[in-house]
Amino acid sequence: PVGSVLVGSQEFINKAHRWRKMFGGGWRQAGVLAAAALYTLDHHIDRLEEDHVRARRVAEAINAMDNFSVDLDAVQSNLVYVNCNIPAADVVTSLAEHGIDMFDLPYNRVRVAIHLHITDEDVERIIAAFAAQ
């Protein structure tokens, strides 16, 4: 929905700010997103790795399935983009029947987002639901 948070040295942030301005980027009410990012950095930074490990588990399992592929090199956060060899809209419908909410993306893809409330058991349910395709 809104992307990510950029973290770095003051020099790096100044350079990024300049590039953002040159390309016309900007969000006037960024404070709400910034507050959420700061809260995460202050309270959840240590557990973000858990999301990344779970995302990697999902990506590797789905990539091994016949109907799907994942660019494993691109899985470096909590997001997994799945290329579907069957209609992504059908995948979304089937996942919903397993209690997993998702939406299809352009180019016959779906995105799996692992977050604070996704457990190891949920990861196994996600994998099983994809395997049922």
Where are these predicted regions, by residue range?
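Conserved C-terminal alpha-helix-loop-beta "cap" of PLP-dependent enzymes
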Residues: R56, N63-A132
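Active-site C-terminal subdomain of aminotransferase-like
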Residues: P1-C84
